[in-house]
Amino acid sequence: MFELKDVTRRFGKKLAVDAVTLTIPQGQMVGIIGRSGAGKSTLLRMINRLQEPSSGSIHFAGVEVSGLRGRALRNWQRDCAMIFQQFNLVPRLDVLTNVMLGRLNHRSTLLSLLNIFTREERVHAIAALERLGIEQTALQPAGTLSGGQQQRVAIARALMQNPKMVLADEPIASLDPLNAKIVMDALRDINEREGITVVTNLHTLDTARNYCERIVGMAGGRVVFDGKPSDLTAEAVKEIYGTDKDGAGIDETMTSTSIDIAPERADNQSAGIQPLALAGL
């Protein structure tokens, strides 16, 4: 069980997140929607403790996450994997190494500094890449990949952490519709197959409806909607996104990312190369 209790964040006089209280059962997939500046990203960064709450508390499995320090905090950031819109990869390092960096908080400092990884870690990393259909990129510099491929590498890196919770901050904001679907399919697969809680910030209403069993709407730093996709009425959407200058509500087709694609794509295959051979194993 994950809980936020009256979590607030101020930046000077600006109230970015205003007394948010949420309870999320283990294994739920939650989409947080709202306009830019609604407080979505700040909320996720506080959950991961990349930013500190000004007040309120955060709890996971009975532990007050907002009070953790030192090694306990590093362990939480390992257990609560974060996926960013900007991917946060090391462009000059190959894809395989970027994925294995997800093991940093599981390893000794010396091994991490020397980038020495075990055979088991390499096998695990290749399996994560294979699961996301990009094992053929294992030895390429991460900076040479497309945006969609880089986001899948970031998801593979998150899997390497063996997380209990995954936070995805606008994971498809910079992607085309095809890659957006691939990334969202991957997040849903993680949620359904491992039973890992996934909380993702999204701009697009159709994506939230199609992938998330629960939707949280934010406006002005506050939660103004919390319910099932079927409960997200036109009035609720208007409260979340506001109206245009004529007072009309938002047209959901303006945020659509819908696209129909086959489950498997030929360019995701590794042309017969065995996955372990890609890692020199």
Swiss-Prot record:
SUPFAM superfamilies tied to this protein: P-loop containing nucleoside triphosphate hydrolases
Keyword Chloroplast part of the UniProt annotation: no
GO terms for cellular component: plasma membrane
Pfam families in UniProt: ABC_tran (PF00005)
Positions bound to ATP: G34, R35, S36, G37, A38, G39, K40, S41
Keywords for the protein's UniProt record, in alphabetical order: ATP-binding, Cell inner membrane, Cell membrane, Membrane, Nucleotide-binding, Phosphonate transport, Translocase, Transport
Keyword field contains Acetylation: no
Subcellular location(s) per record: Cell inner membrane
Molecular function via GO: ABC-type phosphonate transporter activity; ATP binding; ATP hydrolysis activity
EC number: 7.3.2.2
Recorded topology in the membrane: Peripheral membrane protein
SMART domains: AAA
ABC transporter domain segment(s): 2-245
Catalytic activity from the UniProt record: phosphonate(out) + ATP + H2O = phosphonate(in) + ADP + phosphate + H(+)
Predominant localisation class: membrane
Assigned protein family: Belongs to the ABC transporter superfamily. Phosphonates importer (TC 3.A.1.9.1) family.
Subunit structure: The complex is composed of two ATP-binding proteins (PhnC), two transmembrane proteins (PhnE) and a solute-binding protein (PhnD).
Described function: Part of the ABC transporter complex PhnCDE involved in phosphonates import. Responsible for energy coupling to the transport system.
Protein name: Phosphonates import ATP-binding protein PhnC
Gene name of this polypeptide: phnC
